[in-house]
Amino acid sequence: MVATDISRAVQGLSGVPVTVEVDVANGLPSFTIVGLTGRAIQEARERVRAAVRNAGFDFPQRRVTVNLAPAEVPKEGSGFDLAIAVALLRTWRELPLDDVACIGELALDGGVRGVIGVLPMARRLAASGIRRLIVPGENAAEAALVEGTEVIGVESLAVAVAYLEGRVDLAPVAAPPMGEVGASGGVDLAAIRSQALAKRALEIAAAGRHNLLMLGPPGAGKTMLARALAGLLPDLDADEALEVASLYSLRGRLSDRPATSLRPPFRAPHHSVSRAGLIGGGAGIVQPGEVSLAQPSVGLSHMRLGAQRRDLRAHHHGPRHPASDEAERCTLLQRFLFGFGTHPGHPVSAAGPWPGRGPAPAP
């Protein structure tokens, strides 16, 4: 017998709804998962097997095959566990799954653990026509921000099955109101004494969304001025706030910033941040970098002007490879206002020498 369920594969802020197909057939007992899966999904076999048994259900002693379709889409992460288990149980139980998608990682005792990236997953599933989401309880609040979707938070596989069978009535999670005050990193410009010229530069940069270079010795107030620049920017609208919250959800950093906050974010990465940490990337699930987390507000970087400038230039121009050499491309939002702070001893002129590199390259 074949049973199906719906989940989703993450690709940056977009993605593809994934159909989980389970076939239970006669043969030697086995459990196979196919469909261009990553290591975390292959390990789901042991998590699902243990969770199903410890939740009080029988695991079939037959040949079990799970297919994650479409097969050409790479799939990573543990968020498919719940969908696989529900589809498996559906092979011998009546579980209505019309317009329902399941997201969540299973614990060995049958509990449901939270995963990163639930908000962008919920947005994409809602756009594809899914009207009901079953997610881990700790992710329910962020998923409920998506309009037109009924979000059910569950703490265990047994509760999810009981809800689908109609034995338990779970109320949909109410969406928290947008506009909740959150940590934006902003500083009141009026709290900064003197610095009249710098304040004027901040006002011009905020009004025209111009990038800003601040040159001064340590302790001159460059970081405080950059935080004040974030405070000068207007509130985000609802769509922008959801985009920002989706980026933080994908990075697993919603604890740093409430998903309902309308204030522009502020990021100040350390000068030793790697290129991947700055512009994003990674294998499997692509992680947004600091410049993506700063959009559409302020990103501040200190010192090491040459290295950071080379990284940003390389990111701007992109790799010079033909399209045929690219297996996959992922685009992340990177629309931000860049504030740069450096010391007088560092080269800041395009015409000046760069440390260890000779004359600066043409801008």
At which residue positions do the language-model features occur?
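Short gly/ser/thr-rich secondary-structure transition/capping motifs
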Residues: 89, 280-285, 321-327
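AAA+ P-loop NTPase catalytic core and its hallmark functional loops
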Residues: 233, 238, 243-246, 250, ...
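Conserved catalytic network of the ASCE P-loop NTPase/AAA+ motor domain
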Residues: 25, 56-59, 94-95, 127, ...
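Walker A/P-loop
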Residues: 213-258
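Conserved alpha-helical scaffold flanking the Walker A/P-loop in AAA+ ATPase domains
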Residues: 203, 259-266, 276-299
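Peripheral, non-AAA+ core regions of ATP-driven protein-machinery
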Residues: 1-213, 217-224, 326
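The Walker A (P-loop) glycine that initiates the GxxxxGKT/S ATP-binding motif of P-loop NTPases
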Residues: 216, 280, 302
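Conserved AAA+/SF3 P-loop NTPase catalytic/coupling segment centered on the Walker-B
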Residues: 270-274, 287-320, 337, 347-361
